[in-house]
């Protein structure tokens, strides 16, 4: 796992004329993006991701899941039957409700995630980015990181630990996800913004 983030006071107004702190954290802390390089040696690194991939039309798929439950290909197809086909090069965001367990000990171990068939289906549609309100796009118990591997090989971006998805009242919206441009990094904390008409 990753260390707990910490803020280290470094300068202060009284002694230095200004306040400044140091920040120690994993690049995969909080709401964050995985670059393909996180799992593929020759995959794109976070600083190499183009702005075009970070600004897109997005579909919000609401599929409440309990711990250890898969988001399936059928879940996605049910959404498409009701709301229309998901466009190529768009983003897909899954609202499972798992964020409500953020303070629970099992949050990082028993989370829901995508099934391999669901991941392959999204990859076949040339989806740009997939996001979820859990700590991993894979099931917590998947030590092979099966879905990460599928997406990384296709150059797809992953955003994990999304919050406040319940505030998005539309199945379609405009998504902006802004990582830090950290050279050669495997990921970055992000600010994810939904614009709903």
Q: Which functions belong to the PLM regions below?
A:
Residues 1-197:
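Active-/binding-site microenvironments in catalytic and ligand-binding cores
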């Amino acid at each position: 796992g990753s260390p707990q983030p910490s803020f280290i006071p470094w300068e202060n107004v009284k002694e230095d004329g200004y306040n400044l702190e140091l920040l120690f954290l994993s690049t995969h802390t909080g709401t964050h993006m995985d670059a393909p390089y996180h799992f593929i040696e020759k995959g794109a690194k976070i600083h190499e991701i183009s702005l075009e991939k970070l600004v897109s039309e997005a579909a919000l798929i609401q599929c409440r899941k309990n711990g250890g439950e898969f988001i399936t290909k059928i879940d996605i197809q049910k959404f498409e039957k009701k709301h229309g086909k998901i466009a190529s090069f768009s983003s897909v965001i899954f609202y499972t409700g798992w964020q409500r367990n953020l303070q629970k000990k099992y949050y990082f171990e028993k989370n829901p995630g995508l099934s391999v068939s669901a991941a392959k289906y999204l990859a076949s549609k040339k989806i740009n980015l997939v996001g979820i309100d859990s700590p991993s796009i894979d099931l917590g118990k998947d030590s092979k990181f099966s879905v990460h591997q599928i997406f990384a090989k296709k150059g797809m971006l992953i955003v994990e630990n999304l919050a406040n998805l319940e505030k998005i009242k539309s199945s379609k919206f405009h998504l902006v996800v802004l990582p830090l441009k950290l050279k050669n990094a495997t990921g970055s904390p992000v600010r994810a913004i939904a614009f709903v008409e």
